[in-house]
Design a protein with these regions (language model features):
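Histidine-centered active-site/metal-ligand motif
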Residues: 29-34, 113, 168-171
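Generic structural signal for conserved hydrophobic packing positions in ordered secondary structure
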Residues: 13, 38-41, 69, 120, ...
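Metallo-beta-lactamase
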Residues: 53-116
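Active-site metal-binding motif and surrounding structural segment of the metallo-beta-lactamase
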Residues: 7-58, 147
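Active-site neighborhood of phospho(di)ester-bond hydrolases with catalytic His/Asp-centered motifs
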Residues: 2-6, 23-29, 33, 62, ...
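P-loop/Walker A phosphate-binding loop and immediately adjacent motor/lid segment at beta-alpha junctions
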Residues: 41-58, 123, 163-178
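Core dinuclear metal-dependent hydrolase active-site scaffold
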Residues: 1-18, 90-143
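Cap/insert and terminal regions of metallo-dependent hydrolase folds
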Residues: 136-178
Length: 178
């Protein structure tokens, strides 16, 4: 799986993994720095001369992910009328229950950011990784991270009392959440 597809991540991904080997996409939120390369993945999957057989790819994200990602891929009405991406993806909004991508359990919790955003807990064989996505300090992240083996947390703010609330973590905030 891939956790977010911000600008430049698709090119980097291809250095290490065939994009057709992906079993799913998990999007924390829909700001471009977390999903801009979804369009690159879509072009690759749609127009590759030798795609593997089968395979709708699940995309987990906020409820409006399908609409927003279709608009990013097909920016005008004529093009949107020709595709809704349902030939490539099954869009699945987070629903507060554990979902599955293969053997992985996926559980998301809403967190505090400037738009609808989620932290995600990925579990397998009794181990768990929690990805914060963009968030300010919040009890939902702490609850989701409790007992996890690893917290992958963004920490964009310096540790200052005048940071805008509910947008990003500082390194100190990330440490407290862990």
């Amino acid at each position: 799986v891939v956790l977010d597809l911000g600008n430049g991540t698709f090119g980097a991904l291809q250095r290490y993994l065939d994009p057709f080997a992906l079993d799913g996409v998990i999007l924390s939120h829909l700001h471009p720095d977390h999903c801009a390369d979804f369009s690159a993945l879509t072009v690759y999957r749609r127009y590759h001369p030798h795609p593997p057989p089968g395979g709708m790819m699940p995309v987990y994200g906020p409820p409006d992910a399908a609409e927003r990602l279709i608009a990013a891929y097909a920016p005008n009405a004529e093009e949107r009328n020709r595709t809704n991406l349902s030939d490539l993806y099954t869009f699945r909004p987070y629903g507060g229950v554990t979902a599955r991508i293969g053997a992985l359990g996926i559980l998301a919790a809403p967190v505090e950011h400037s738009c609808e955003a989620y932290a995600v807990r990925i579990s397998h064989a009794g181990r768990a990784l929690v990805y914060s996505g963009d968030t300010g300090p919040c009890p939902q992240l702490v609850k989701l991270a409790t007992g996890a083996d690893l917290l992958l947390a963004e920490a964009s703010w310096p540790d200052r009392p005048d940071n805008p609330a509910g947008i990003h973590l500082s390194g100190k905030d990330a440490g407290k959440a862990a």
